Amino acid sequence: MRKTELLIPAGSLDVLKTAVIYGADAVYIGGEAFGLRAKAHNFSLEDMKEGIAFAHAHDVTVYVTANILAHNQDLPGVEAYFEELKEVGPDALIISDPGVFEIAKRVLPDTELHISTQANNTNYGTYLFWNRMGAKRVVSARELSLAEIKEIRAHIPDDMEIESFIHGAMCISYSGRCLLSNFFTGRDANQGACTHPCRWKYSIVEETRPGEYMPVYENERGTYIFNSKDVCMIEHVPELIDAGIDSFKIEGRMKTALYVATVARTYRKAIDDYMKDPKLYEANMEWYKEEIGKCTYREFTTGFYFGKPGSDAQIYNSNTYVKNYTYLGTVEEADGKGRCRIEQKNKFSVGETIEIMKPDGRNLEVVVKSICDEDGNEQESAPHPKQILWVDLGADVDKYDILRKKEDN
């Protein structure tokens, strides 16, 4: 059986550390340019160095995205950026553009090159082409079924790796090649600046009836594709492994630490349980599904993995997100006596019941005993985001634990 890698996204240094602590085998990040997530916090070169050193100290690898579709004016900057990455030492670069690929081969000859899903990797001929060019890994197009991936695996060299998105948001356009953002806002999705107009609300206007706006909605005869559900394959880990997928990729370089920790920890346990004993994996299925439901998400689908998705893979109302738990903060320091320091993310109060989420899989339900600011002044609640607080939980709490609170839905 091939070793399965769990690949987790990180949009900031803090989230990278969370991903590492909560079970990632590898983390993918973006720099301040050329990485298709202009709105993510992204990493300075100094943050990259620190993050890669932290990951390597925990035997975790780090991949840097450089997967824009480059224009002529981008190429000199790409080369200069890759020269800077020599000092950073990423384990691999994720690339979609052949011109950028050639620059990477020349400037970073000892760094693994992975081909992004943006390159429309839908057949084994494409995989073999990139293998001849020197790529170590190809990220499969989201439009592929498990049967197609299995066929690709049978046609490519054994040491070539397949990476696939198995959890998170799906772009409505073929392998992410969308022009809606460009058209409506002038922001290029293929340059990392997508404004996600696929999630907006639309009406139809017939040209001979100006001013008559008809809302787009679903009925028993119609199928609409603008607002996809999120992919979730937590119930299908055996099928993913059987298809020959080497790296299970989670989408979400703009997600919170709570999201990253929850998804990483859940898939880590699911993979490990299955590898240990398939019956253990089946026995713990309800726990996996319950945990995945504790982060903010859209409704779930299996995407294209079992064939073309139908109308049940789309969302037809405006309230697309499901939010069951709120992220309160990550423990930055603990005194060993039940008190911890956090940077507060959302409001909570003394006397409230919250949950301590631990990297080892435990969840501890506790009552907040007291809240103090940095100067030791007590306060009844924490209403100000980013305030540094000392919180007395009277329980086993450690650095990197995450505090979360159940929503009153």
Please tell me what each predicted stretch does.
Residues 1-10, 15-21, 26-29, 33, ...:
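Surface-exposed amphipathic alpha-helical tracts and adjacent flexible/coil segments at the periphery
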Residues 37-56:
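Glycine-rich, positively charged N-terminal anion/phosphate-binding segment
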Residues 39, 117-121, 140, 224:
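Alpha-helix capping and helix-loop boundary segments enriched in small/acidic/polar residues
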Residues 64-65, 95, 115-117:
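Short beta-strand elements of ligand-binding domains
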Residues 75-76, 110-124:
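Gly/Gly-Pro- and Ser/Thr-rich, intrinsically disordered tail segments characteristic of DNA damage-repair
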Residues 99-100:
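Alpha-helix capping/helix-boundary segments
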Residues 105:
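Short glycine-biased active-site loop of nucleotidyltransferases that positions the nucleotide triphosphate
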